[in-house]
């Protein structure tokens, strides 16, 4: 078979069409004694069902049995005796069932004289069914699938337009379920999935034209969705059996009926029924029960001939065991009698397990061929094929040329390499078909070229050999710096494919081994190089279908190449390629590829997005711990792979565009290449900036150290906290809350004690750049600014002086005591602002540190355009540290804008008059009490939401809602006594609270919907963010009402 693929006379270039490759009839190979026969069948392939066919070479001695045997052998069929061979004339209803003993050449000469070869269709069909055939076929999957496709085709051609709408809908939905059995039961509810089925696949493949024409599109869609849900849980085999169950009452596909007469004249007109259950029986009327004539094991001989009258009818005689005389049947023509004889003979051979025919007829020249050549064992076949070429002239079992995939099979003669020029080396990997070895190619241009050699373990099988060479014949068409280059092939057994050697191996292993040495720019560079290779494939109309880090090879530290083209396909004139079977990489595949086995450049884009994610994750596989069957469910629920650590947001945004559910919304590879180029350049610029900043920082640290090993008691600069600190320094309780978080960025000790670094461990200074320090340590930088004491210490250190150990110890102890005193004072003064100031967005801290505050400098409680609350009174300065708090305020850094746990007076220390909430009597203030109640409800929900199961979300949100309703009712009672000019602003604040509650409920529903997925935590965070917004806006409402009250008091105050 492989030889046929490699023969340029039998194959076409990638731009030609498979449909015009061969006619329905035959062709002769130039200079050969063989002829070529195209046989249509129902073995599934990726082409349209109407083009499923095999091309078979045959000699003059080949009989029909040999043709059937060769086709079914390639599909590993068990019930070979069930198959028959039909010849149909395409321009008339003329049909001939060819007996297995008939010679193919004689048949062709006989019938092709009557009509041109292209008007005849040779077809392999299942004709002879055993009793309980469905149960037997379930153990022979190729036969079951073949029979299903055959029956479905007959149904669509013959009766589909006449059946009830309900039956047509069920049968069509069962075919959808069988074809796309991995698709979830509710997949057709998605508009994009239904549109793929409707526009790309075509509804006419599943439903009759009468149904599609008579029902409106919107109604039809609803009917299909409703019907499909009935079969949502069926697998492929169950769908097939259910199809037969629904179809059998309206279409008897398990028997054949012939209108004829019993006897030698038209005395009794009957309908003769022949099938596995009835045997041979007849019906006189449609409504009556069949009358049994004989079983197949009772038939001893079969004869047929022309009648002697002028009508030249066909006569069929069956000798039945125990019957006094033969059973005679008169058929309308000799052809029908001959077809009936073939059917009964096939059943007799099947029931008796015989190969010898039961038909007795006079021998006519050319009518019967020599007996079939017995089937040889594999070793005997191999021995025969190693002889001279002339043996092929008498070998009736020549190769089959399946039309599937022939579009990527040009000649390999230019790439053939002599085996003696290859030195096979050590094994460096394992492929789908065999091992991959390192070797040397002794070529004239390069006497010692290092190469990779793919070997094939089981290439004695023609089908395996073809699939193995498929990759080479695909690769030979590519020439790109980031695609592995084909050097040559050896097509004689053992078959080898010789490719360029990428010395650093596959990308996934490379990323895992060098996880800590590869920088972000290198990872983005790899993604960019792959995008250029895939843009090249897209331009040549190829789909790769297996884009993953394991299939990318590393040529050097700055060069990767796309390899493994075993699944690649040329798309011809079609916009997509459909895979019919075989193992596919589910966790990398696009949803339409999983659901419909539909592969396009857009599905390659999805896979490339997953491959980029693998690269940024240093070789981690996607959807770890998730079963293949569960992947599509998660994707359809909106789940996507999370953002990798240190991944630029622009790059992750590009990945998510690649993972758009609708293929039409994904970018093309040309766009991806351009955007990745931009991201790469940006990362290089940032990398250079970080290196310059790091150099300056190292220089500063080196200058500050002054040759001393002493660590400073506190960070020396507000924007650049030194990683060094004293062993006696302990962070405040605010910092202790997030110990785990800080261990990443500068608190590796188990008790939060900072590690010694600086000049002692210079390598640690570059672990985090300035941006990362700000992200990881906002509170630390804003909290610990140098006091006068620290400045003195730094001055001493700068002059090269070292404090005595006992003075250093005293200073550290005193400093720790002062910090504890500061903390107690701050906690006391915290009560100055009401309600609880810890309710700022981002400051309602949970232990997991999920929330970050806004990035602006405005305090979160204060509405835009409103003054800040008054600052608390300043603490009297300690001796030796005057103005400590004012210094802290005056040198506040941008890091304070994170506002994560930072107290409000640190953000806005200046005093503002009049304070909106501080100087009012709250003794009977119902609005204030209800705002406080709402805030408490939010705090309670925030503390309970993390461990709570989804069913407890509703009661917690309900408590918040009740608190809000009470607050709004109180505000409604308060509004009439306030100035009319303030009503509008209060109503707007109320509407904002209602909107906040709606957002909270929406996020709660999402958190419940995506429970047990990786998105659950994300939606919990969004739920808490919405609750925090509600609390903050409630405080804003209180501020608005307080200002209205102050305005009212100002109007009533005597001048």
From Swiss-Prot:
It comes from the Eukaryota. InterPro entries: Band_41_domain, FADK_N, FAK1-like_FERM_C, FAK1/PYK2_FERM_C, FERM/acyl-CoA-bd_prot_sf, FERM_2, FERM_central, FERM_domain. Interacts with GIT1. Component of a complex that contains at least FER, CTTN and PTK2/FAK1. Interacts with BMX. Interacts with STEAP4. Interacts with ZFYVE21. Interacts with ESR1. Interacts with PIK3R1 or PIK3R2. Interacts with FGR, FLT4 and RET. Interacts with EPHA2 in resting cells; activation of EPHA2 recruits PTPN11, leading to dephosphorylation of PTK2/FAK1 and dissociation of the complex. Interacts with EPHA1 (kinase activity-dependent). Interacts with P53/TP53. Interacts (via first Pro-rich region) with CAS family members (via SH3 domain), including BCAR1, BCAR3, and CASS4. Keywords: Acetylation, Angiogenesis, ATP-binding, Cell junction, Cell membrane, Cell projection, Cytoplasm, Cytoskeleton, Developmental protein, Isopeptide bond, Kinase, Membrane, Nucleotide-binding, Nucleus, Phosphoprotein, Transferase, Tyrosine-protein kinase, Ubl conjugation. The modification Phosphotyrosine is found at residues 5, 397, 407, 570, 576-577, 861, 928. It is a peripheral membrane protein. It catalyses: L-tyrosyl-[protein] + ATP = O-phospho-L-tyrosyl-[protein] + ADP + H(+). Non-receptor protein-tyrosine kinase that plays an essential role in regulating cell migration, adhesion, spreading, reorganization of the actin cytoskeleton, formation and disassembly of focal adhesions and cell protrusions, cell cycle progression, cell proliferation and apoptosis. Required for early embryonic development and placenta development. Required for embryonic angiogenesis, normal cardiomyocyte migration and proliferation, and normal heart development. SUPFAM superfamilies: FAT domain of focal adhesion kinase, PH domain-like, Protein kinase-like (PK-like), Second domain of FERM, Ubiquitin-like. It is found in: Cell junction, Focal adhesion; Cell membrane; Cytoplasm, Perinuclear region; Cytoplasm, Cell cortex. Phosphorylated on tyrosine residues upon activation, e.g. upon integrin signaling. Tyr-397 is the major autophosphorylation site, but other kinases can also phosphorylate this residue. Phosphorylation at Tyr-397 promotes interaction with SRC and SRC family members, leading to phosphorylation at Tyr-576, Tyr-577 and at additional tyrosine residues. FGR promotes phosphorylation at Tyr-397 and Tyr-576. FER promotes phosphorylation at Tyr-577, Tyr-861 and Tyr-928, even when cells are not adherent. Tyr-397, Tyr-576 and Ser-722 are phosphorylated only when cells are adherent. Sumoylated; this enhances autophosphorylation. Residues 422-680 form the Protein kinase domain. This is Focal adhesion kinase 1. Its main location: other. One of its GO terms (molecular function) is protein kinase binding. The modification Phosphothreonine is found at residues 13, 917. Residues 915-1055 are annotated as: Interaction with ARHGEF28. There is a cross-link at residue 152 (Glycyl lysine isopeptide (Lys-Gly) (interchain with G-Cter in SUMO)). The active site is at 546 (proton acceptor). Residues 10-27, 886-896 have a biased composition (Polar residues). Residues 685-697, 837-849 have a biased composition (Basic and acidic residues). Residues 707-1055 are annotated as: Interaction with TGFB1I1. The first Pro-rich domain interacts with the SH3 domain of CAS family members, such as BCAR1 and NEDD9. The C-terminal region is the site of focal adhesion targeting (FAT) sequence which mediates the localization of FAK1 to focal adhesions. It holds the Pfam family PK_Tyr_Ser-Thr.
């Amino acid at each position: 078979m492989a030889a046929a693929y490699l023969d340029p006379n039998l194959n076409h270039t990638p731009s030609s069409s498979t449909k015009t490759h061969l006619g329905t009839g035959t062709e002769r190979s130039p200079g050969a004694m063989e002829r070529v026969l195209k046989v249509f069948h129902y073995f599934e392939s990726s082409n349209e069902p109407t083009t499923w066919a095999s091309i078979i070479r045959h000699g003059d001695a080949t009989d029909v049995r040999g043709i059937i045997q060769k086709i079914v052998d390639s599909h590993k069929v068990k019930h070979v005796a069930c198959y028959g061979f039909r010849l149909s004339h395409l321009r008339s209803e003329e049909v001939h069932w060819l007996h297995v003993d008939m010679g193919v050449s004689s048949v062709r000469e006989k019938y092709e004289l009557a009509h041109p070869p292209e008007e005849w269709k040779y077809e392999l069909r299942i004709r002879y069914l055993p009793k309980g055939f469905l149960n037997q076929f379930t153990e022979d999957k190729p036969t079951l699938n073949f029979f299903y496709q055959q029956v479905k085709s007959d149904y669509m051609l013959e009766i589909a337009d006449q059946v009830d709408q309900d039956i047509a809908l069920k049968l069509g939905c069962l075919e959808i379920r069988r074809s796309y059995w991995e698709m979830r039961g509710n997949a057709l509810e998605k508009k994009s999935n239904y549109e793929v089925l409707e526009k790309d696949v075509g509804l006419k493949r599943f439903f009759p034209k009468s149904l599609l024409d008579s029902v409106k599109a919107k109604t039809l869609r609803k009917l299909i969705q409703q019907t499909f849900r009935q079969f949502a849980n069926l697998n492929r085999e169950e769908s097939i059996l259910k199809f037969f169950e629904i179809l059998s009452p309206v279409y008897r596909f398990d028997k054949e009926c012939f209108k004829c007469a019993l006897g030698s004249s038209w005395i009794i007109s009957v309908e003769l029924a022949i099938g596995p259950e009835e045997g041979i029986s007849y019906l006189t009327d449609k409504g009556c029960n069949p009358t049994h004539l004989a079983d197949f094991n009772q038939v001893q001989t079969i004869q047929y001939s022309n009648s002697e009258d002028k009508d030249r009818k066909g006569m069929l005689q069956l000798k039945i065991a125990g019957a006094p005389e033969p059973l005679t049947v008169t058929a309308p023509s000799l052809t029908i009698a001959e077809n009936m004889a073939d059917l009964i003979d096939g059943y007799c051979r099947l029931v008796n397990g015989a190969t010898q025919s039961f038909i007795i007829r006079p021998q006519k020249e050319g009518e019967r061929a020599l007996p079939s050549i017995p089937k040889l064992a594999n070793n005997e076949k191999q021995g025969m094929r190693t002889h001279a070429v002339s043996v092929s002239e008498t070998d009736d079992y020549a190769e089959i040329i399946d039309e599937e995939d022939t579009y990527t099979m040009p000649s390999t003669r230019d790439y053939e390499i002599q085996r003696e020029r290859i030195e096979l080396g050590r094994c460096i990997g394992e492929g789908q078909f065999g091992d991959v070895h390192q070797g040397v190619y002794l070529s004239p241009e390069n006497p010692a070229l290092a190469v990779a050699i793919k070997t094939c373990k089981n290439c004695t099988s023609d089908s395996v050999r073809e699939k193995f060479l498929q990759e080479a014949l695909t690769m030979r068409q590519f020439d790109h710096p980031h695609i592995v280059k084909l050097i040559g092939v050896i097509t004689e057994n053992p078959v080898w494919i010789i490719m360029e050697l990428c010395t650093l191996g596959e990308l996934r292993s490379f990323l895992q081994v060098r996880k800590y040495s590869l920088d972000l720019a290198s990872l983005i560079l790899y993604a960019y190089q792959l995008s250029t290779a895939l843009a090249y494939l897209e331009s040549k109309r190829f789909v790769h279908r297996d884009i993953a880090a394991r299939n990318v090879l590393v040529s050097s530290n700055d060069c990767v190449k796309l390899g493994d083209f075993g699944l690649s396909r040329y798309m011809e004139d079609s916009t997509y390629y459909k895979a019919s079977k075989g193992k596919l990489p589910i966790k990398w595949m696009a949803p339409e590829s999983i659901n419909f086995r539909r592969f396009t450049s857009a599905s390659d884009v999805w896979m490339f997005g997953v491959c980029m994610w693998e690269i940024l994750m240093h070789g981690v596989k996607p959807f770890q711990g998730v079963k293949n069957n569960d992947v599509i469910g998660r994707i359809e629920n909106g789940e996507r792979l999370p953002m990798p650590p240190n991944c630029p947001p622009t790059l992750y945004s590009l990945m998510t565009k690649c993972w758009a559910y609708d293929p039409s919304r994904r970018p093309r590879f040309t766009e991806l290449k351009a955007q990745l180029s931009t991201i790469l350049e940006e990362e290089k610029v940032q990398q250079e900036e970080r290196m310059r900043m790091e150099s300056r920082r190292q220089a500063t640290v080196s200058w500050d150290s002054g040759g001393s090993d002493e660590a400073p008691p506190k960070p020396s600069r507000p924007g650049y906290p030194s990683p060094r600190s004293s062993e006696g320094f302990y962070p405040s309780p605010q910092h202790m809350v997030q110990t785990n978080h800080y261990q990443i960025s500068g608190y590796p000790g188990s008790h939060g004690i900072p590690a010694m670094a600086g000049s002692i461990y210079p390598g640690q200074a570059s672990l985090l750049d300035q941006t990362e320090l700000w992200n990881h340590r906002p509170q630390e930088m804003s909290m610990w600014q140098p006091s006068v004491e620290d400045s003195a210490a730094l001055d001493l250190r700068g002059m090269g002086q070292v404090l005595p150990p006992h003075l250093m110890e005293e200073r550290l102890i005193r400093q720790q005591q002062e910090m504890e005193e500061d903390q107690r004072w701050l906690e006391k003064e915290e009560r100055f602002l009401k309600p609880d100031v810890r309710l700022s967005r981002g400051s309602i801290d949970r232990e997991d540190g999920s929330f970050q505050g806004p990035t602006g400098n405005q305090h979160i409680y204060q509405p835009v355009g409103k003054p800040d609350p008054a600052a608390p009174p300043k603490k009297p300065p300690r001796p030796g540290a005057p103005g400590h708090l004012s210094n802290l305020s005056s040198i506040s850094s941008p890091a304070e804008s994170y506002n994560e746990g930072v107290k409000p007076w640190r953000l806005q220390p200046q005093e503002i008059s009049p304070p909106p909430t501080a100087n009012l009597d709250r003794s009977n203030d119902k609005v204030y009490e209800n705002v406080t109640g709402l805030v408490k409800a939010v705090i309670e929900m925030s503390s309970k939401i993390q461990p709570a199961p989804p069913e407890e979300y509703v009661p917690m949100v309900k408590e918040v809602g009740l608190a809000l309703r009470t607050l709004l009712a109180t505000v409604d009672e308060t509004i009439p006594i306030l100035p009319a000019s303030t009503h509008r602003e209060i109503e707007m604040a109320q509407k904002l609270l209602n909107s906040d509650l709606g957002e909270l409920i929406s996020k709660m529903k999402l958190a419940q919907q995506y429970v047990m997925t990786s998105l659950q935590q994300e939606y919990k965070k969004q739920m808490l963010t919405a609750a925090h917004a509600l609390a903050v806006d409630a405080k804003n409402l209180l501020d608005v009402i307080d200002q209205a009250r102050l305005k009212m008091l100002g109007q009533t105050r005597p001048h």
